[in-house]
Amino acid sequence: MERQSQMSEENLNNTAAPAEAAGSEQEMNSLMQQRVAKVKELREAGIDPFGHAFPGAQSVQSVREKAAPAEGGEFGPEVTVAGRLMAKRGMGKSIFADIKDSTGRIQLFVGKSEIGDEAFALFRKLDIGDIIGVHGPTFVTRMGELTIRVKECTLLSKSLRPLPEKYHGLQDVEQRYRQRYLDLIMNDESF
């Protein structure tokens, strides 16, 4: 009797796992379908979502080294940086975002009045994981964070697959080895 109850609990546990996996797989398919729809919208708007060159891009590390901290709202030198969009925080007519390249991470400030309505609408539609190029002057926020005030933004490559959650990240060691590209994107310690 006790053995039967253990077996039935195991069966319940085994059936729950595939259901959860199917749910996350459906969620993944839904996210990918949304991103494919965004690619279609971009193409209809005359924007090529893949395969751009972005000449003159500097590394984040070189921008951090060369940018002298501007004081009292002054702007530093104009820089051109390309990287993967890692975070986006919208606040009405302005957006703060983070991009990351192989040398580090830097914050962006995108203002609607600075880049115009069309470019701002395009930036709002960008997803985490998309690769973008930006141009603009540097400044230091009140919190002491070096930031680029974006004057121009170019979509270099659209990401069709979503990145793993930031909070949980890639915890499974086997998955980190199988999907090394994700490990390199998400974990700075992997380099």
Predicted feature descriptions by range:
Residues 1-191:
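Class II aminoacyl-tRNA synthetase catalytic cores and aaRS-like
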